[in-house]
């Protein structure tokens, strides 16, 4: 597994909206990532032909065993890649939740996740925990290929064991204070990656 992080604001053209800058940066990041793996060497600036699963997860038809996933939030774009296992990544900038953390959790989280939030010592800890749980769940659903349609409330997060739905997750160092970054990879807990 390898993670690539870019501040897309640094390449954003005057007047260009955020999504356009992100869309322009994604293939560049993917080409950089592909060049880091030996089985892509010698491709000489290969065009990156991407397709999507019916659920919308991107993949490379020419290298179906190579897995990758993007996430963006705030000023950053993150790419997670794995040459062997399905992978999902989520980045979130900590921002106030308009509807309220508990209200959002009641709508979208498993009851066990909601209980964790209710036990937070104060509003600041509750907000950080909300985004930790959110990124774990979103990374998991992206890893499984379901996306948010898979339901954030389907299974609880086990923070102590760093797993969700039988898969491990890794909370990574974010690109900047005030962000949360999580990766989930599809190898079983009993057999960690090589």
How would you name each of these model-derived features?
Residues 1-194:
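Core catalytic alpha/beta fold that binds nucleotide/phospho-ligands
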């Amino acid at each position: 597994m390898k993670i690539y992080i870019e501040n897309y604001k640094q390449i954003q053209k005057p007047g260009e909206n955020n999504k356009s800058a992100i869309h322009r940066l994604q293939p560049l990041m993917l080409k950089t990532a592909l060049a880091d793996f030996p089985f892509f060497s010698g491709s000489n600036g290969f065009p990156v032909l991407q397709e999507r699963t019916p659920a919308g997860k991107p993949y490379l038809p020419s290298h179906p065993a190579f897995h990758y996933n993007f996430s963006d939030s705030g000023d950053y774009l993150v790419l997670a890649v794995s040459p062997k296992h399905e992978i999902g990544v989520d980045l979130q900038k900590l921002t106030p939740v308009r509807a309220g953390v508990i209200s959002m959790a009641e709508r979208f989280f498993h009851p066990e996740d909601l209980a964790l939030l209710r036990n937070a010592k104060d509003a600041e800890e509750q907000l950080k925990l909300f985004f930790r749980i959110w990124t774990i769940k979103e990374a998991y659903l992206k890893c499984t290929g379901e996306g948010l349609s898979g339901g954030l409330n389907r299974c609880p997060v086990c923070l102590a064991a760093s797993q969700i739905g039988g898969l491990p997750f890794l909370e990574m160092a974010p690109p900047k204070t005030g962000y949360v970054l999580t990766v989930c990879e599809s190898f079983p807990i009993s057999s960690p990656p090589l």
